[in-house]
Structure formats: C-alpha cells, structure tokens
Regions:
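Tandem repeat scaffolds
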Residues: 4-8, 13-134
Length: 134
C-alpha cells in the first residue's frame, strides 16, 4: 500500500481594493464624517486627523496618503475598497468595525486596536504593526 500524500490547502487569494474614479478631497475626513454617513470616491493626502470619534459610518473607495491619525476612534464603521499609504495609525481604534478589501502599505500601526473587527481580504505590506491588538 502506497502512503498517501498529505492534504495541502491551496493558497488563499486575497482580492485587492477596487479603487476607481477618486477625486482629491479639499476637506478633512472629519469634516466629511460630520455631515455624511458614507464617504466615498475620495483621495485624502498629507494632513492630520485628530480626536475623531465616530460610530456607524462607511468609507468606500477611498485612499489615504501620508495621513497621521491621532487619538481617533472609529467604532462599528465599515471600510470597503480602502487603501492607507504611508499613514500613521498608531493607537487608533477600529473596534467592532469591518474592513473589506483594505490595504495598509508602509503604515505605522503600533498599538492599533482591532477588537471584534471583521477582517476580509486585508493586506499589510511593509508595516510596523507591533503591539497590534486583534
């Protein structure tokens, strides 16, 4: 009797975000979230977002480049097709949120809180994620 080959799971294919038709935002993310339930199709660049605390908001088809998030809490928020590039998300809280097709590229994620957060098709490339809380 020949020994059987061990079962090997095929690699999981992670789907990248679909980022299309984005406009450069003239307002901060906080200004958008103060007036909108859903923020979509925007590119945010080089700014600081401080002391934001929002719940039950949606962010769709957005890119964040060189953004520093300081003392921010985004509870039960939904992120779909979002890319963070060269951002500092240290100690930000995404508690009870869902992240679907989200990329973190060259980001600082030290102490980022993701308790009870749903992570689907999420990638982290060249990130510092020490003390990340899942």
């Amino acid at each position: 009797m020949k020994p059987s080959k061990p079962f090997v799971m095929p690699p999981v294919r992670i789907i990248p975000p679909t980022l299309e038709g984005q406009s450069e935002s003239s307002k901060s993310l906080e200004e958008w979230l103060n007036t909108e339930e859903t923020v979509r199709d925007l590119h945010f660049g080089k700014r600081t977002e401080e002391h934001m605390e929002y719940s039950y908001k949606s962010i769709t088809n957005c890119t964040f480049s060189h953004i520093q998030f300081s003392a921010c809490k985004l509870k039960s928020c939904h992120f779909t097709d979002v890319r963070f590039e060269h951002c500092d998300l240290s100690n930000i809280s995404f508690a009870e949120s869902s992240l679907f097709r989200v990329e973190f590229i060259s980001c600082k994620l030290v102490g980022t809180n993701l308790p009870e957060t749903i992570l689907n098709h999420l990638t982290m490339k060249d990130c510092n994620a020490r003390y990340l809380n899942l």
